Design a protein with these regions (language model features):
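PRY/SPRY (B30.2) beta-sandwich protein-interaction domains
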Residues: 1-167
């Protein structure tokens, strides 16, 4: 299950999101307040994309992740966003790239990966219950991998990230 606006069309077991021409955010529905969590987002098509995490109470009608203080996003230009403020962060990304999101609620940090290359810790001092999220200006397609599909629904995954048990 997911939380979104009508700007998105959902398919493939709620793992593929196609966004229309409207602003909006789509969020996973299982929030995390402790532990270490990881997902990958395949960037299939579009422009002006953003991936990240948001408090489970954040509004899906916001223009983008990080528009308010309850979200933390990594924009396709390489900037990071929170509280409606942008700053330099990592490499830009484009169609065909896979963006990993490592949410460490024990340390209160979120780190982003581009094609399995860490961009460094983007944000710290996170507290509360967070969900994974994507969104943009419209017209983009995303595929999410929460570990269910090592082939990434036919798209190549960055893989290589494992927990302490090697999984």
């Amino acid at each position: 299950p997911i939380a979104t606006t009508s700007a998105f069309t959902i398919a493939e077991g709620s793992l593929k999101a196609t966004q229309s021409a409207n602003h909006g955010i789509i969020k996973s529905t299982i929030s995390q307040s402790t532990g270490k969590w990881y997902c990958e987002i395949g960037i299939i098509s579009g422009s002006s994309r953003m991936v990240g995490v948001a408090l489970d109470t954040s509004l899906v009608t916001q223009n983008y992740i990080g528009h308010a203080a309850d979200g933390y996003g990594y924009y396709s230009s390489g900037q990071k966003y929170s509280n409606n403020s942008a700053s330099s962060y990592g490499a830009s990304y484009a169609n065909g790239d896979v963006i990993g999101i490592a949410l460490d609620m024990d340390a209160g940090t979120v780190t982003f990966y581009k094609n399995n290359s860490s961009q460094g810790a983007a944000f710290s001092s996170l507290s509360g219950s967070f969900v994974f999220a994507v969104g943009d200006d419209g017209g983009s397609v995303y595929v999410a991998n929460f570990g269910q599909d090592s082939s990434f629904a036919g798209n190549e995954t960055a893989q290589g990230n494992a927990d302490g048990n090697g999984i």
